[in-house]
């Protein structure tokens, strides 16, 4: 039965497109700049899911290593902290919150609601960036995750390593990413 949704929608973009996204001058549109920054942060952190970025805490970063648990699987991941990640974090004021990124900003409002609203806003703005760049697929936060996996595979990184890096429960899940 065809549900109207194709199982594997092409979501990955090549490294040259990632570079175009990174290098786009968005100084005149802070909201597009913010969306791009979160997209790039995801890419730099092995395609970290938006929900995981939202709940990253400042205390998760210690001695040059970011340690967090995937919301979806509970798997603990370790990521070496790199300069481009720090540059994004430094751009935004998150004082008054325990969070590393400016996604959950108001400590008196439901965190899940804020994350959902931010995800919607960011994906809406990423689609706009994608249209600006003339991309054939809608640009969303998910594209960063798929792109990281595909680019890693193109660099001959073993699927087992890509799978572990993405916090997948099985290599079968990673293979679905790499097929799309």
Where does each model-flagged region fall?
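Short, basic (Lys/Arg/His-rich) helix/loop patches that form interaction surfaces
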Residues: 23-30, 123-164
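Long, amphipathic, Lys/Arg-enriched alpha-helical "connector/arm" segment
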Residues: 2-33
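Phosphate-coordinating loops and pocket residues in cytosolic domains that bind phosphorylated ligands
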Residues: 23, 55, 179
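Active-site/catalytic core of tyrosine-dependent DNA strand-transfer enzymes
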Residues: 12-19, 82-136
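Catalytic-site neighborhood detector that most strongly recognizes the C-terminal catalytic loop/helix
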Residues: 4, 70-74, 166-180
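Short, contiguous acidic/charged loop-to-helix segments that flank catalytic cores in large enzymes
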Residues: 26-30, 67-78, 109-118, 136-143
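C-terminal catalytic core of tyrosine-transesterase DNA break-rejoin enzymes
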Residues: 40, 44, 48-52, 145-169, ...
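Conserved tyrosine-mediated DNA breakage-rejoining catalytic core shared by Y-recombinases
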Residues: 1, 45, 55-91
